[in-house]
From Swiss-Prot:
Species this protein is from: Burkholderia lata (strain ATCC 17760 / DSM 23089 / LMG 22485 / NCIMB 9086 / R18194 / 383)
Cellular location(s): Cell inner membrane
Molecular-function GO term, any one: ATP binding
Organism classification: Bacteria, Pseudomonadati, Pseudomonadota, Betaproteobacteria, Burkholderiales
Name of the featured protein: ATP synthase gamma chain
Membrane topology annotation: Peripheral membrane protein
KW Cell inner membrane (keyword) present: yes
PANTHER family: ATP SYNTHASE GAMMA CHAIN, ATP SYNTHASE SUBUNIT GAMMA, MITOCHONDRIAL
């Protein structure tokens, strides 16, 4: 009977765990939908800023913003690492951290030092353990990221690049593909290549639906900073959508596994109970025969 009592305890424990993982799955599904909405809402802003900057850059080819000029003499590169603040999201962080380590090695093989900015507690902890130099950090963004909270940490990297101290700035994050698939990517943020401005809205460079003051240079300076900030925000938004999707899938898998374990334990319990009943019946029959 002690064995049956122990099995009942295990079944109860797994059932309680399944209730928790099921609740977390439902919460993650709700947060995932909101995160996807924020991710999609951020795209039109970045696209419009890019289109305007593209028009003005072509209209003023003699001016080159520092973000568009390669700092070939710099011996240090910057990486903005975007991870989550919480765990229980499968291999999401592991994949982007593995890609970041590979990028560190590639840059170091080229004679480049690496200085990092951490967005997310998991990435910050990893960089500290890895021994990387952390220039700036921002953690505990919550479920709704605000650009105001990101700007300070990101601006450190942008300022160093503008001063010619960084050869390039990369951003590592998890791109949202769909609910079941997310992929770790590392993209070059600076210098801005011509590819950033190739796909515009089809309006000729000499046609404008806006005016600017005091001059094109001042506007381009502001627009390019806003554009890079928008790219960072988009990466964070995609990472958050990926986080909630991965967490929902992980919790669903945990709930399904718990259900399987409960079924197996229930089978063991039934067999033990059947064996105990059979033994009691045998003892009763044996006693009656003796009488």
């Amino acid at each position: 009977m002690a064995g049956m009592k122990e099995i009942r305890g295990k079944i109860k424990s797994v059932q309680n765990t399944r209730k928790i993982t099921k609740a977390m799955e439902m919460v993650a599904a709700s947060k995932m939908r909101r995160a996807q909405e924020r991710m999609r809402a951020a795209r039109p802003y970045a696209d419009k800023v890019r289109a305007i900057a593209a028009h003005m850059s072509r209209a003023n080819p003699e001016y080159r913003h520092p973000f568009m000029v390669a700092n070939e003499g710099a011996k240090t590169a910057g990486i903005i690492l975007v991870t989550t603040d919480k765990g229980l999201c499968g291999g999401l962080n592991t994949n982007v951290l593995r890609a970041t380590v590979q990028k560190f090695k590639e840059l170091e093989e080229k004679g480049q030092k690496v200085e990092a900015t951490a967005i997310g507690s998991k990435g910050l902890g990893f960089l500290n353990r890895f021994g990387a130099k952390v220039l700036s950090q921002v953690v505990h963004l919550g479920d709704t990221p605000h650009l105001d909270k990101l700007i300070g940490a990101v601006k450190t990297q942008l300022d160093l690049y503008s001063e010619g101290k960084l050869s390039a700035v990369y951003i590592a994050y998890t791109r949202f593909v769909n609910t079941m698939k997310q992929e770790a990517v590392i993209e070059q943020l600076l210098p801005l290549s011509s590819e950033h401005f190739e796909a515009d809205d089809g309006t000729p460079a000499t046609s404008w639906d806006y005016i600017y003051e005091p001059d094109a240079q001042a506007v381009v300076d502001e627009l390019l900073v806003r554009y890079v900030e928008a790219l960072v925000y988009q990466a964070v938004a995609e990472n958050m959508a990926s986080e909630q999707s991965a967490r929902m899938v992980a919790m669903k898998a945990a709930s399904d596994n718990a259900k399987t374990v409960i079924s197996e334990l229930q089978l063991v319990y039934n067999k033990s109970r059947q064996a105990a009943i059979t033994k009691e019946l045998s003892e009763i029959v044996g006693g009656a025969a003796a009488v």
